[in-house]
Amino acid sequence: MDPNNQIQAPVENYANPRTCLFHVLFKGAALAFYILSALFFNSFVIIFVVTVLLAALDFWVVKNVSGRILVGLRWWNEINDLGESVWKFESLDQESLARMNKKDSWLFWWTLYLAAAAWFILGVFSLIRFQADYLLVVGVCLSLNVANIIGFTKCKKDAKKQFQQFASQTIASRFQSTVQSAFTLV
């Protein structure tokens, strides 16, 4: 209780602090290494390899671990027999999605967008300084971040669409059974 005798609402903590840590850690590691690497390394190859490796680890962790745990979504892309790209989505049911921790979800989405914005800004700096080689590093990292943004955004929309279809089918079937039972009694 506070001095004014008002009851304070409980502060919601992160439900999955380790997952949140690794979700942020790999993004931060890739960005920090890229930004600070010029101070410690003269070799573009080392900077390229380590930065892209950290960004790839971030991509994998977000796509396969933190996306599933923090927001209940997972996506992947397959090439079918006709050579067409097919998006596949997994999501928790709507009830489970509604129970997801709001802080975890907030952290997931904001860091996803902020990391992409940071890579974009670094790309602009590379353009201004006429560093095409560093623009390549930024382009790879930005592409990985944008792929996750697109994948998870499509997955979230697909989950909402599936819920709406399920709700309309449930309502229609209940209405149909109510109408049938009404006519059966007559």
From Swiss-Prot:
Q: Which residues cross the membrane?
A: 35-55, 108-128, 132-152
Where it sits in the cell: the answer is: Golgi apparatus, trans-Golgi network membrane; Early endosome membrane
Alphabetically list the UniProt keywords: Acetylation, Endosome, Golgi apparatus, Membrane, Transmembrane, Transmembrane helix
GO annotations under biological process?
A: Golgi organization; plant organ development; protein secretion; unidimensional cell growth; vacuolar transport
For the keyword Chloroplast, the answer is: no
Q: Can you supply one Gene Ontology CC term for this chain's record? A: early endosome membrane
UniProt note: phenotype after gene disruption: Severe size reduction of all organs. Abnormal cell wall composition.
Among Pfam families, the record links this protein to:
DUF846
N-acetylmethionine-modified residues are: M1
The membrane topology of this protein is:
Multi-pass membrane protein
InterPro entries (alphabetical): TVP23-like
Homology family = Belongs to the TVP23 family.
* Record's function text: Mediates trans-Golgi-network trafficking and cell elongation. Required for keeping the appropriate balance between secretory trafficking and vacuolar targeting of a subset of proteins. The ECH/YIP4 complex is involved in the modulation of the trans-Golgi network (TGN)-mediated trafficking of some proteins and cell wall components (e.g. pectin and hemicellulose) to the cell wall in dark-grown hypocotyls and in secretory cells of the seed coat.
Subunit composition and interactions: Component of a trans-Golgi network (TGN)-localized ECH/YIP4 complex made of ECH, YIP4A and YIP4B. Interacts directly with YIP4A and YIP4B.
Protein name per the record: Golgi apparatus membrane protein-like protein ECHIDNA
Which organism does this record belong to?
Arabidopsis thaliana
